[in-house]
Amino acid sequence: MSNNTTVPTPANPAGWKFETRQIHAGQAPDAATGARALPIYQTTSFVFDSAEQAANRFALAELGPIYTRMTNPTQEVIENRIASLEGGVGALLLASGQAAITYAILNIAGAGDHVVASPSVYGGTYNLLKYTLADLGIETTFVEDPDNLDEWRAAVRPNTKLFYGESVPNPRNDVLDIEPIAKIAHENGVPLIVDNTVPTPYLLRPIEHGADVVVHSATKYLGGHGTSIGGVIVDSGNFDYGADPEKFPKFNQPAPGYHGLVYARDLGKDSAFGANLSYILKARVSLLRDTGAAISPTNAFNIGIGLETLSLRIERHIENATKVAHWLEANPQVDKVIWAGVESSPWYERAQKYLPKGPGAVLGFTLKDATLEQTRDFVDALKLHSNVANIGDVRSLVIHPASTTHSQLSAEELEKIGVYPNFVRLAVGIENIDDILADLQLGFDTLS
């Protein structure tokens, strides 16, 4: 081996493949005890070596643990691991996916600002953008057709601060055309935030296609076992918030809570940290500090356990989802299968570009000529599938979105995202495929 070759380590894992980094990135054996597994640091606070060190940490002159509301060593390992898997410079693990989405937006936009978003998003995100953020003075324009790039261009205003979309939306299962949308965002001087929950970085890394910030509900496939709530923001470090001080004043004006610190100048691309950390550190030391959506060390640990098998689980999820989708397509009682992995999908070709290993394991289908009541009966007949609001579990899951996860939307809004009364959503698990198909047949038997 050449002396010039950098040997990968947990602290610098760039030379390792994805499957290795999901296990090792960010964590070496515990220096004090030699513990091989990640310790759970179940503590509220951390002892400072000196009064000077304490002062430096509070002033952000030195990075290190202060209080578990802001960071914790267990949490930090998982943040570094997810940042490595997504290709970002840093990450912030939070109490839920909804907290991650909220912080990702509020870190940039405030009262009087404007967001351009795809309408094809999770129901909770749609509500956040349309109602809750509107209460805070942030207006969102949802493009009618996220595949129409001209609509993204036309929606931009002088006060637009960011674009937002989901890589593979739940439950419409279209595929966001990240590269041209990112280009339009950058032409207008704003970042693109992409929710990558459904595919995970094993199937798609939005930063490689131009996204600036990636968010996840870590509750789903990153954790993978339906045990722990969490969310994460990953920053690419590529967007320079200091390039337009007028558009991003919160990054370019002195922060009153930190004695004049200027995020873009002091933590940005030319800072002493060697990377543009202005976005991710601002989210931590301002939003998280002040509003407190902190993840518990135990939940961070559980999500880390899930990450260790991410690639193996996703491969099995995709294998089963592919078989379920083709089985459904061959069923005369099915009107339409909604999944970008089947050739009948309008987004099949785009999925081949962005997601060659598969578009995730969340799929939907409509029952031919079924009423809302018959569709609910279908769901109730299943025994192996769990009727839950979650996705991303090793277990196979089912739900009727029109009366549950998306019930807050109007009939017109439901139609726009493809949630019809006869629509069923599946999150295909990793059980034996024969058992999954046999259980789905129980539902079809109720229609006969």
Residue ranges and their predicted role:
Residues 1-65:
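N-terminal glycine-rich, Lys/His-bearing helix-loop that initiates the first secondary-structure elements
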Residues 2-6, 130-131, 139-140, 154, ...:
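PLP-dependent enzyme catalytic core of the Aspartate aminotransferase-like
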Residues 27, 42-46, 69-71, 95, ...:
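Pocket-edge structural micro-motifs
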Residues 45, 236-239, 367-370:
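Short loop segments at secondary-structure junctions
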Residues 45, 50-102, 124-132:
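Conserved N-terminal alpha-helix of the aminotransferase class I/II PLP-enzyme fold
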Residues 63, 89, 299-303, 308, ...:
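Short amphipathic alpha-helical segments
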